[in-house]
Amino acid sequence: MDNVKLDGPADILVTLGLTLPSVSETELADIRAAAPPRSTVRVASTMKAAIETAGDVEVILGFIPKPLFDVAPKLRWVHCIAAGMDMFLYPEMQASSIVLTGEKGLVGGHLADTGFGLLLALTRQIATAIRLGPEGWNRREAMRMVEIELEGLTMGVVGFGGTGRAMARRAVAFGMDVIACDVVAGPPSDGVADVWSMNRLDELLAASDVVAVGAPLTAETRGLFDGRRFAAMKPGALFVNVTRGEIVDDRALVDALRIGHLGGAALDVAPIEPLPPDHPLWTFDNVVMTPHTAGASQRRGPRNIQRFCENLRRAQTGDALLGVVDKQLGY
């Protein structure tokens, strides 16, 4: 089921959390105006409060962890503010008739901003300069010797959805050549020379100076970047990941860095979060990391509320909802 019809008043719950820390009175008014007449719109400031009041809820804006799902028997539709849906696709949700919508097309830009920022911090020695502080002036010559220019290099994008396309646009703006792999091969777009099927992934890896992950976490992508994949990459290639850490075998990544096969890694995500202080990734000067912050933007909440309101209107007319997630595929 990929659509929902709201024929009468609905019980709507807005759950605040990491990706929707607050909702203004104006935004609540917009939700009430978009909802069917006489609908109830409530806000739960904590997940505990949401669980305690979810018995009659039909529509949720926010996260849907398993404990909330378990106490919401009337639930019909969830708009989940999450770039990746993997944590909410437990078997019971997948088997249910609940419609799940999300942020497709809304978050790729700021994820790519972080990805490209980390790439620049790595290639232009920005991270090294910040780490060294005043000592950087004494290391200036050594830093200049290893700076990398992006123009003319090839970026291979793995997963050509919203995040992958946004990375590609930024790479093209920096004068890079871009190729991509996706589960569905397609014609060139967003300045990309080719969009190949995933069975050509090794070919993409061998041709790329920078490999950027834009794929969601699914059964097919979990552990995709293992020792064999890293070995297939160009010697000295750079690796960028801002989507899900579990796509990468971190031991294989550490090994590829340790032997010098990889030139560096730019990461916003890790298989274990928080990444333990004694994890080997912290020991490499050619690894730059942020603590899973790429998904943040001051416009993220408002954009999702706008989509939610549009979908409330569509749910009353029977039109197709925006951002529907295929619960079996995971995106």
Language-model features, listed with the residues they occupy:
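N-terminal Rossmann-fold NAD(P) dinucleotide-binding loop
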Residues: 164-165
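Short loop/helix-cap segments at secondary-structure boundaries that form the rim of catalytic
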Residues: 51-54, 68-73, 88-95, 169, ...
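Rossmann-like adenosine-cofactor binding region
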Residues: 183-280
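An N-terminal-biased, well-structured beta-alpha scaffold segment characteristic
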Residues: 1-101, 226
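Glycine-rich Rossmann-fold phosphate-binding loop(s) that bind the pyrophosphate
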Residues: 160-161
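Phosphate-binding beta-alpha-beta segment of Rossmann-like dinucleotide-binding domains, i.e.
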Residues: 98-154, 321
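Rossmann-like dinucleotide-binding domain for NAD(H)/NADP(H)
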Residues: 236-238, 242-331
